[in-house]
Amino acid sequence: MFKLAINRPITVLMFFLALMIFGLISAFSMSVNLFPNVSIPLIKITSKINGDLNFVESKVTKEIENALSEIDGVKTITSTAYDNFSVSVVEFKLGKNLEVAANDVRDKIGTLSLPSKPEIEKIGSDSGSAISLFLYSKDKLQLMREINDKIKPFLQRVEGVGKIEAKGFLEPQIRIELKPNELRKYNLNALDVANIIKSQNFKQALGELNNNQDNYIIKGYFEATNLEELSNLRIKTGVFLSDIANISSLYEDEKQSALYEGKEGVLLELGKITNYNTPEMIKNVKNALPILEKQIPKDISINMLYDKSLNIHKHLSQVIFDMVLGIFLTLVIVFLFLRNLSATLIACIAIPTSIISTFFIIDLLGYDLNRLTFIALTLSIGIFIDDAIVVIENIAKKLKTYPPLQAAFLGINEIGFSVLSISIVLLCVFIPISYMNSIPGLFFNALGISVASGIVISFLVSVFLIPSIGARFLNPKENKFYEKTEAFFEKIEQKYENLLYKILQNKVKFILATLVFIGFSFALATRIGLDFLPMEDDSEIQVLLESKKDLSLEAMKEKSLNLLEKIKNDSNVKYAFLLVGYDDAKDATKAKIYVKLKNLDERNLRQSAIVSLYRQKFQDESLKIKILELPKIEGAGIDDPVQFLILGDDLNTLKEAASQAKEILGTNARIVDISDNANTTKDEVALHINKEKAKLLDVNPQYIAGVLGYSFSQLSVGSMDRGNSKDDIILSFAPEFKKDIEALKRISIKNNQGINLELSSVVDFIYSKDLKTINRYNKNRSVKITAGVNDLSLGAVQKLLLDNMDKILNNNPSLSYAFSGFINLLGETVQGFAMAVALAFVLIYLVLAALYESFILPLIIMITMPLAFGGASIGLFITGHNFSLFVLIAIILLFGMVGKNAILLVDVANKKCHEGLDPDKALLIAGKSRLRAILMTTFAMIFAMLPLALSRGAGYEANSPMAIAIIFGLISSTLLTLLVVPALFKFCFKLDSKLRKIYEREKLN
């Protein structure tokens, strides 16, 4: 194969050109995202039912949970019961197809006998808002109609657009607002009016007419077609609907509000279709907006408030810049070591060829282009050029004594086995990653596949393209710069040889010192914090507000606007908008402020500093205020960094445990915004019927409920056609008659004989408080404790809770606990990392043992891996960074990198020993001959990492610790590889020789 590559240069060149062409096509056609496509299969089940909280929990929520738990692949079930409705979200294990999951849920829910049919919705975690549009018009009703009739349908047709949520949208309605005084005047109540309207305003199929020739369907059209007809609807003799009510075309009562720049409008949050390219979808929407604006009234304004693609492009641009700079620095290092322009240029070919061709492999395997892809390629620059350098150096040596083509063949033939060994070892590091079926596993997988693809291409480039080009263009002549600097390198080699000689004479002491270093660094690692993903400065934060009292929407709006104005006055803020009642229940006591900060170069403080400042600055005794940096992974409830659940059946016991947990978290000043969802109560007017009076006066409780429902709720009594759609006709009291308990007491009811009575004659009214919600997790009642952190790792918070778990649960066997959100993902990360590393070590040993036909040599090579981990730990400790998903990814890559140097050294020493040299002499020759290659590849890798380590641009919070871990790991492992591996080789050589005598025999011919 080597001869074929050298003898047929055009064939080889065309093959790699083809790979690069396909790579370029893939690079420009692949889906682009910030991170690997983390689509958590989530299904949301919403059930509406007339009933109080406990009834909803027992008759709906529990029934749904029991059915869901029987479905294969369910990971967690999170439910919330409210008055009159229930919401359950089931999270499936990764790999479960969302469509299959939805069908499984429908099948199971379909077997239940529920009061009403639940709504089942697919909410894959990647379907969150990609772009947000704020719509405003002075004519509010016109805005709502345009959104319903034109804007939403238009946007839904844009390619890539998935679910559209309209925050602050009010459904257009025909409002019949009753006047209680007029009702009393005519001896009527709301239920009477509702029944009369229903009996006169309807459309109904009434049968068929059939004869021998024709068939006719009989339909009765008895509904009003306009407001005037509805107003003239006769209630009783001489009394029309307009006499007892105000009738208008309006919209539903406001339960949710969206505000921007002091204006109240509607926020449209556009999600993307699962697996669709986010920037492409956003581009499609932006291109469609000018067309949309021409189709709607001019007084409707559209403002773009959120654009996810900006962050994606910002991060990718920064990583690509760091990669290009890393390539340049790497080439400078290579030239300084080789001091040969032709050799440097030939080595240079390996980098773009490997990177561009890798895109084709990644695309072929179904992956997208994301930040981790480019980081992986940046981390691999040293690997790509290292293979080429090893081959070029060997060919250059042969060129001194052989003709070019023969030198190229002998050079690659001699070093090919080492290059193959190195490539296989690197692949062994990344193959185990593919077994990680978890969210962190998707991150590891994306990087692992990218690096593994690059390694395969790099190997092909090194053994086929480089020898082919080197045989024709490599100039072995030494220039003046080479001659002037050669003495420096020879001096280093001589000093290393002298040092190595001393080490070999004191090998036991040095090995013991190395073991002490490993022990020290591992002990140091336990003092380094552990996070899932570092928070990055993306110029956006959110402020969550919750009133401690049960406020109205208007009161909550006023409080939230006061805080919004303070935030907008901050010189670091670009703009901000407010959502009140943003959750599923449209709870008016909850609000959210999205804060868009100015770009990093336009403000004085970093995002984390602003968050800390806001936590100190914005405090209100009547509000719970949380300041959060936006999470980088959406879905599965991961807004709060710290999420801890206590599970049980008794709510009072759960509250006590939650209080204890909050107290323990509060002992650490760096744990902030500590809160729980245990004490969410609402003010309530409880109506208790006096059964004796009701029996005496012959009053039906069901009748009372009907009167009150049509008086104070928003119940439909019909609909009115409006062209392509219908407006519900809603009956209730006018707002001014729904403000206090006196309005209730004045309600007129009738007994079974039709005699008018005051409601207060049979009902007692009591002010009370009741739970807003009952929260459940995996079929247990739950209380969730959430918190943020200031300069503290999530691992430290988890340890604090685990160390005090007996105190929190009070040794109560009915209580249990669970972590969710980032802490849960952190556990999955550590577990997956440990399994991947263990499997990688086993595979590396198996491969090296097979390649070297030795049980001992692989162990000598593998000692470099804990040495690298030790260096990485020291680097993180010195710079004050934590272990995180990105750092652990880097450490896995590091294990592959550092094995290269040991292989280069051991391979030569092993060959020399088999040629008859004693171990000391073999090691001195191996060390001296491989020193430059090892130093050059190490420096090349380090300088490739420097831009990532030193950059303060987008994403540095995650990129910098990763690069620092690699740099320090390379330094420690390289220094100790050059010193420890020879000592270990000598120490183990006799044992290896004895073992070989057992299993080696004269080989068959």
List where the protein language model places each region:
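Signature of alpha-helical transmembrane segments and their immediate interfacial
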Residues: M1-V32, N413-I415, F481-L533, F644, ...
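Interfacial segments of transmembrane alpha-helices in multi-pass membrane proteins
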Residues: F2-I10, T274-N277, H313-N370, I431, ...
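Transmembrane alpha-helices and their membrane-interface boundaries in multi-pass membrane transporters
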Residues: L364, I381-I395, G416-Y435, L442-Y482, ...
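Helix-loop junctions and hydrophobic alpha-helical segments within the transmembrane domains
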Residues: L305, I312, L316, I392, ...
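C-terminal transmembrane helical bundles of large multi-pass transporters
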Residues: K308, D620-Y999, N1005
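Solvent-exposed, membrane-proximal periplasmic/extracellular interface segments of envelope transport
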Residues: I6, V56-S125, N181-F202, E554-G637, ...
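Transmembrane helices with small-residue packing motifs
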Residues: I10-T11, L17-N54, K96, G110-K117, ...
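Membrane-proximal extracytoplasmic
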Residues: M1-V324, L369, L442, D640-Q643, ...
